[in-house]
């Protein structure tokens, strides 16, 4: 008899894409997949586009959003838990997988109240508030990076599920210093304003041949393209890169934020990187994500407070002339990557659906 999985993931690509990777793997094995999210975030379009039905609940974040929202939070949470329970009664999943996003909190509580096994996956090196709370209710807690939760019988490090086409990329190769440096700029699914503003001038000031592909985020393409044109730099600018595997394969160096999915894809792709973590990320989780590769010699760390035209230009110029260093960084990235994370998470879903408890796992 076919098993059913309910995936809870939304808000950003860092939550949605790993969930899709697991969903695709289980669907190929005969599972039925449903999704729980919110109607005003990216999962509302992205998940149906991948062929999965999605149900919505009404929920918003409560951290750092003012006293009125904080006071209204208990009512909203209770309402959203009841909505999630109705979804569970309709779908009757064998397992509920929480990948992060606003819907995960109420959905996780509803799963626990309904007696449905709850499996959590924490994508960041620092656990988010929702997963910290839900961990008490979950049968199993999976981590992308060590240290997000204390080691126990119920926890395991499995990596971040990344797109299979990224995992399938060949081993990194040394590029010739006589050729232009292939520079990929990735601001995450929502773009990164500081990269959009600083990189064009830095590329121009580097004083070395550089070819650029720049993912700028929705609504930013025209202004970023104009910034490159003003500096006399030819660049391929796009709001969203559909084929990230091709982009990583092309790149000698990536300059990017340090969201969980980006860090994991950089590692899986085997490409050198300069990480510029989002400075105001909750619990500074992007810095901790970045350090998992920086500490292994696979990437460089550039705090946003130190990011200037001159500082980035100097790094680009230095690395462009040291292709062996870039290759060593790329190889180190591939070495620390966990490339079968989607399979590991899918296997955990199957074990819970089969009735194995945390001690058996």
Curated annotation (Swiss-Prot):
It holds the Pfam family Glyco_tran_28_C. Keywords: Cell cycle, Cell division, Cell inner membrane, Cell membrane, Cell shape, Cell wall biogenesis/degradation, Glycosyltransferase, Membrane, Peptidoglycan synthesis, Transferase. UDP-N-acetyl-alpha-D-glucosamine binds at residues 12-14, 124, 163, 189, 241, 260-265, 286. Pathway: Cell wall biogenesis; peptidoglycan biosynthesis. It catalyses: di-trans,octa-cis-undecaprenyl diphospho-N-acetyl-alpha-D-muramoyl-L-alanyl-D-glutamyl-meso-2,6-diaminopimeloyl-D-alanyl-D-alanine + UDP-N-acetyl-alpha-D-glucosamine = di-trans,octa-cis-undecaprenyl diphospho-[N-acetyl-alpha-D-glucosaminyl-(1->4)]-N-acetyl-alpha-D-muramoyl-L-alanyl-D-glutamyl-meso-2,6-diaminopimeloyl-D-alanyl-D-alanine + UDP + H(+). Belongs to the glycosyltransferase 28 family. MurG subfamily. This is UDP-N-acetylglucosamine--N-acetylmuramyl-(pentapeptide) pyrophosphoryl-undecaprenol N-acetylglucosamine transferase. It comes from Aeromonas salmonicida (strain A449). The gene is murG.
């Amino acid at each position: 008899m076919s098993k059913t999985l309910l995936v809870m993931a939304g808000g950003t690509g860092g939550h949605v894409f790993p969930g899709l990777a697991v969903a695709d793997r289980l669907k190929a094995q005969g599972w039925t997949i449903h999704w729980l999210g919110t109607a005003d975030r990216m999962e509302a379009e992205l998940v149906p586009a991948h062929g999965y039905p999605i149900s919505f609940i009404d929920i918003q974040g409560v951290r750092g959003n003012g006293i009125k929202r904080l006071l209204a939070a208990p009512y909203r949470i209770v309402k959203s838990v009841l909505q999630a329970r109705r979804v569970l009664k309709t779908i009757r999943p064998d397992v509920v997988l929480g990948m992060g996003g606003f819907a995960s909190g109420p959905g996780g509580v509803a799963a626990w109240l309904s007696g449905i096994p709850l499996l959590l996956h924490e994508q960041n090196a620092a656990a988010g508030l929702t997963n910290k709370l839900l961990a008490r209710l979950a049968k199993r807690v999976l981590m992308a990076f060590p240290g997000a939760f204390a080691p126990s019988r119920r926890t395991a490090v499995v990596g971040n599920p990344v797109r299979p086409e990224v995992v399938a990329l060949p081993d990194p190769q040394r590029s010739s210093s006589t050729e232009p440096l292939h520079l990929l700029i990735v601001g995450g699914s929502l773009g990164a304003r500081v990269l959009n503003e600083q990189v064009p001038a830095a590329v121009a000031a580097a004083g070395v041949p550089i070819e650029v592909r720049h993912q700028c985020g929705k609504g930013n393409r025209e202004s970023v393209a104009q910034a490159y044109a003003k500096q006399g730099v030819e660049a391929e600018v796009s709001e969203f890169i559909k084929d990230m595997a091709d982009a990583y394969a092309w790149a000698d160096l990536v300059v990017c934020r340090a969201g969980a999915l980006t860090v994991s894809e950089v590692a899986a792709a085997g490409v050198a990187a300069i990480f510029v973590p989002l400075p105001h990320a909750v619990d500074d989780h992007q810095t901790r994500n970045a350090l998992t590769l920086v500490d292994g010699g696979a990437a460089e760390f550039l705090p946003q407070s130190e990011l200037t035209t001159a500082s980035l230009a100097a790094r680009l110029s230095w690395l462009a002339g040291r292709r062996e260093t870039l290759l060593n960084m790329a190889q180190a990235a591939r070495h620390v990557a966990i490339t079968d994370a989607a399979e590991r998470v899918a296997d955990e879903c199957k074990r819970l659906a089969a009735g194995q408890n945390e001690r058996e796992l």
